[in-house]
């Protein structure tokens, strides 16, 4: 019989008596019942009577004191043994109040720990600390030094007599040192230390340490007998260091410049405007204002020539001023206005006009520069520019501050201008027209022409653009569409450089530019040569048109279908024949495209056009529009299933995607080349709406799907692929044919033949010098198409076959 464990006894090994109080036992064990106060007493009494059993109780004996004589007496019933929990409770405390088996509480009695008046009940960190003075001074470092000195001396010592003498000397020195220390402590206030005394004391101390290394017979009792005052010296006053000068050293700290963590870009893009930036050493960003004029290789030469011309003009102008002064003096003093006749006055006026023309045309005077300084340009409201002179007109208009470009003010970003897309502009005399797209204004996403007045009202009222920024925005739109026409750089091609320095007075009198060109230096012109002027003028003339980027645009058409025509710009000035040729090419191109384009009607069999069987209706393949139409018809029919012909794996996947969009179940049927898709209606198909967005995406992808279980007739395949393969080859080669056998001889017009004939070659001769000429008959190259050997020709094959037949 198997052994029963202890836990079976509590499950019905013997019946227990009902306990008093409320309720009774429930279940199999007494621990699960809700009996009275003394439930399970008979069981505990029976188990306690067994030898070696513990009395299991959580009530401490004798208030937790094991030395209590009443410990064995229980308040409720007598205890025969001490339980294990009682001892644990005595040393470590209750489980509910303290940690389980805490060693910190093992040294405390349980009853003492509960007593609040007991001083030992406080924690160790809260108890007071008591300090007790030691009987002797504890100096382990000094003892360690002496022990090491004795050990080293014992290893080196050989003669004990010398050691004894040294020990006596060490004792004498130690007594002297002790006397000095005691005297120093008594007369500490009257002693002043110098640097020499301190050095001597340090030397004596080192000497005493050296002597102590040689001593090995001094006992520890001699050291302990010395008092602390004799061993240690306390300097209460310290050294007087006020008399020593202190050097002040000033160190300049160089602060390291911290690099900025911001990445710098030299181009700032605001809309379609690019601004070049630069950064200095202090990480400050500024606008890089570079000159707009492009550098030219002859720039320095031209500038030097103009400077020399100006210098010579200044020299000549001084001479003219002197002559003018003399003439004015003579006219003012000798010839008063009252004495002159009318004819003489006219002659003087002519002479003055002549001199004035020479000065203004040939020589720039100071009055011209003054007039240029007084001139200024003003801009009116109607976009017209007027030039005013301070000296000529008394009413001076103030310069109108130019508004900054669009995108440089915060007001420009308060409006969302991305809603308006301007694609073209038509410039007019007063107003412009804009070709723009704006859903907020037109209600669609197509481009429309709009005049400037309506466009400005939309910007100010709907987009809430400030009125003062409308002009800047319109200028920004215009600059983005119409490129700025940079003025051409001066070519100076119309300024001839004269070879002689002598000029007639008649040439100076006329307002011609030749007077300016006469100031050039003759020596430099001779050195540079005659062709330098032409080279400079030619290079400057075509400098701007050398690297020009031409915009490429698609052809513009009008009309649809057969009425589609080509739009040609009127600025090209094409004749009627050219226009007709272009239109004919366009129509031919459209016809070829229409022939190549395959429609969904091309895949449907005309005999089975209304059939429900797709295998008969589409004998060779599908167009993607055919697949969509079949799904639409399948939704309207009463049929529950429909099978598609076998297609390639990608085509089957496309049909599965179409079925998912129409909420139809799809499954594969068949094997190999006969694998096709079968679709079936479900409950969701009737009540759900198809996903036409996904269907539209599928129709824009692969257009044609051909069947893989049937083959098309050869005639249809040839017609379809005839345009792709191109024309057939015109030349064919045969086995054993000589390459170039029927080629004509190289004519005498050939350059290579002429060169050979000049070198002495004639037709029929070999190439090379006399005595070392090459072959006269060229080597013939034959065509080899078969896999037989090089010497195995077609004639040999024929002869071999005939001989074999003869042998048989």
Swiss-Prot record:
Which InterPro entries does the entry link to?
G_patch_dom, R3H_dom_sf, R3H_G-patch, Splicing_assoc_domain
Q: Name one GO cellular component term.
A: cytoplasm
Gene Ontology MF, one: enzyme activator activity
Q: Where is the R3H domain?
A: 621-683
Q: Tell me if Cytoplasm is a UniProt keyword of this record.
A: yes
Q: Where is the composition biased (Basic residues)?
A: 1-20, 28-37, 782-791
Where do the G-patch domain residues begin and end? Answer: 748-795
Q: What is a single Pfam family found in this protein's UniProt entry?
A: G-patch
Example GO BP: maturation of SSU-rRNA
Q: Where is the composition biased (Basic and acidic residues)?
A: 39-48, 153-179
Q: Where in the cell is it found?
A: Cytoplasm; Nucleus
What keywords would UniProt list here?
Answer: Cytoplasm, mRNA processing, mRNA splicing, Nucleus
Q: Where is this region: Disordered?
A: 1-67, 151-180, 485-529, 764-808
Entry annotated with the keyword RNA-binding: no
State the protein's purpose: May be involved in splicing.
Query: What family does this belong to?
Result: Belongs to the SQS1 family.
Supply the name of the protein: Protein SQS1
Which species is this UniProt entry from?
Candida glabrata (strain ATCC 2001 / BCRC 20586 / JCM 3761 / NBRC 0622 / NRRL Y-65 / CBS 138) (Yeast)
Task: Report the gene name.
Answer: SQS1
